[in-house]
Amino acid sequence: MAKVSLEKLLRIPPSLTQSISQTKVDYLNLGHSGLRVSRPILGGLHLGSRKWLPWVLDEEKALPILKAAYDLGVNTWDTANVYSNGESERIIAKALSKYKIPRNKVVLMTKCYRVMSDPERFDPGSGVTMHHELADYSKDYVNQWGLSRRALFSAVEASLDRLNTSYIDVLQIHRFDHTVPPEETMSALNDLIRAGMVRYIGASSMWTFQFATLQHIAETKGLTKFISMQNHYNLIYREEEREMNQYCKMTGVGLIPWGPLASGRLARRPTQEEGSLRASCSAHGSLYESDDYNVDRIIQRVAEIAEKRGWPMSHVSLAWLNRRVTAPIIGFGSVGRIEEALAARGKELSRDEEQYLEELYVPQRIQGHS
């Protein structure tokens, strides 16, 4: 009887087999932490209100994308309090509720630092976040942004309310705050973790010396250190390779880059029409100069390898990137885009192909730092 029971326990349960077969992603440890995140991570910049940016998906279109992502195994969702002035966080909470997704089965990542629309005059389309340097001159916005103890606790409390959750898995500081002593920032972040409001902390685009300073303060004072860096990194913007990527690799910080496909440029030929509303809007005033000769030549080489291998261009770009990071953050405009990205799973380029893609790169001005 005992032998029969043991044999039954040793069999893989059908429910586990089914779950594995439905999972179309890999899960990797985020830096030296024990937290495992999906590759890719879903980016929440695309979800919110079209009043904020014309290519953002309103709730009606955003909810099915979150459901599809979850069903396929993309259970790590990144957002920020300023995305559509909080609407992105609210829609994520709506998805968890509407589709009865257990909170413990998703990893929620959000960010704070920038100023948001005043709740008393709330406007999801407000561009106040682009003018945080003026906030401290306003009676309504003073102390409502940045990385002070006051601002951090207020931001996290508000994000918890919008996300309808008791904790944030990874709280990321959106940029470095020059106006606050770094010791105050790291102490407050540590206290947020001790209070149970946050599980882990991460950071986003900044200079390496700034990030190293924050990590050094945490280490010397026995405070919680950052486990992730969300920086700007892709085949046509590789300035982070100079210091930040190497520092993170050396110190066990996971890289989760934004803009992995350069607003879609690395997923289509230079002469091809924009594949999304965001791409067409980004053609003017984009981070990526549309007439950069070397950039276009790199993209053309992505197209050559894609044609040779019979892959979409996005798979070539992601195959190059995935060897160098933990997980890229991708904003999906449709369920089809999710499926395309997940089909890149396990694909690798040869060293010769990687060198062919890399050799045309020339240094660029630093983009995305505060």
Curated annotation (Swiss-Prot):
Signal peptide: none
Pfam families xrefs: Aldo_ket_red
Superkingdom of origin: Eukaryota
Assigned keywords, A-Z: NADP, Oxidoreductase
UniProt binding sites for NADP(+): 78, 204-205, 230, 259-269, 333-341
Disruption phenotype: Impairs the production of destruxins.
Enzyme class: oxidoreductase
Enzyme Commission number: 1.1.1.-
Cysteine disulfide partners in this protein: none
SUPFAM superfamilies attached to this UniProt entry: NAD(P)-linked oxidoreductase
Gene Ontology molecular-function annotations: oxidoreductase activity
Catalytic machinery residues: 83
Binding sites annotated in the UniProt record for substrate: 174
Role: Aldo-keto reductase; part of the gene cluster that mediates the biosynthesis of destruxins, insecticidal cyclic hexadepsipeptides which induce flaccid paralysis and visceral muscle contraction in insects through targeting the calcium channels and vacuolar-type ATPases. The aldo-keto reductase dtxS3 converts alpha-ketoisocaproic acid from deaminated leucine into alpha-hydroxyisocaproic acid (HIC), which is the first substrate for destruxin assembly by dtxS1.
Family from the record: Belongs to the aldo/keto reductase family.
Protein's recorded name: Aldo-keto reductase dtxS3
